[in-house]
Curated annotation (Swiss-Prot):
Residues in HTH tetR-type domain copies: 10-70
Coiled coil regions, renumbered to chain: 117-144
Organism, scientific name: Salmonella dublin (strain CT_02021853)
Location(s) in or outside the cell: Cytoplasm, Nucleoid
GO MF entry, a single one: DNA-binding transcription factor activity
Pfam families named among the record's database cross-references: SlmA-like_C, TetR_N
Keywords: Cell cycle, Cell division, Coiled coil, Cytoplasm, DNA-binding
Protein name: Nucleoid occlusion factor SlmA
Record-level GO cellular component terms: bacterial nucleoid; cytoplasm
DNA-binding region in chain numbering: 33-52
Subunit note: Homodimer. Interacts with FtsZ.
InterPro entries membership: DNA-bd_HTH_TetR-type_CS (IPR023772), Homeodomain-like_sf (IPR009057), HTH-type_TetR-like_transc_reg (IPR050109), HTH_TetR (IPR001647), NO_SlmA (IPR023769), SlmA-like_C (IPR054580), Tet_transcr_reg_TetR-rel_C_sf (IPR036271)
GO biological process, one term: negative regulation of division septum assembly
Amino acid sequence: MAEKQTAKRNRREEILQSLALMLESSDGSQRITTAKLAASVGVSEAALYRHFPSKTRMFDSLIEFIEDSLITRINLILKDEKNTSTRLRLIMLLILGFGERNPGLTRILTGHALMFEQDRLQGRINQLFERIEAQLRQVLREKRMREGEGYTTDENLLASQLLAFCEGMLSRFVRSEFKYRPTDDFDARWPLIAAQLQ
C-alpha cells in the first residue's frame, strides 16, 4: 500500500514538473492543453485525471508550491535577520532568485500562464503578492521599534514600491523569454532602491 502511495505521489510530481517545464518552454506562452501535457508526461489524458481532477487543480498545486517556498523562506529571513535594510534586501533577492531559478513558475507569478485559466487562480496569485506586500510593510513599520527611527515616507507606499520593482523584474524576465535574469545587477540596483527608503 505504501509503495502504491509513493508511486502515485511520484507520478503527481512528474506531472507538475512537466507542466512547469512546458511553461518554461515556448509552449508556455500559449494555452497548455491536457492533451499536450499528457503527451509530455507519456501518459493518457485519463491517467492525468486519475492524479488531478482538472488542469486547474494542477495549477493550484504549483501555486501552493510557490506560496510555501516564498512565505516559508520570508519567515526564516524575518527570524534570522534583525536589520531592516538587510531584511528588505534579502526578501527582494528571494523573490527575484526564486523567479530566476523557476522560469516556468515565473509565468504563473506574472499571470501570463493563467490568462486562459480560471480567474480564481489569478486571485490566488494576487493574494500571495498581497501577503508579501503586507510582510514588507510590517518590516518597514518595525524599523521604529527595532532601530529607534522610522521612515518619513508612508510604509504603504514604500512596500508597494519594493514589490512593484520585483514584479517588474519578473515581468521583464518573462517578456525577454528568460534572457534578462531578475537578479542581474541587483547589487548595483540596491543602493538606488535603498535611497528611496526614507
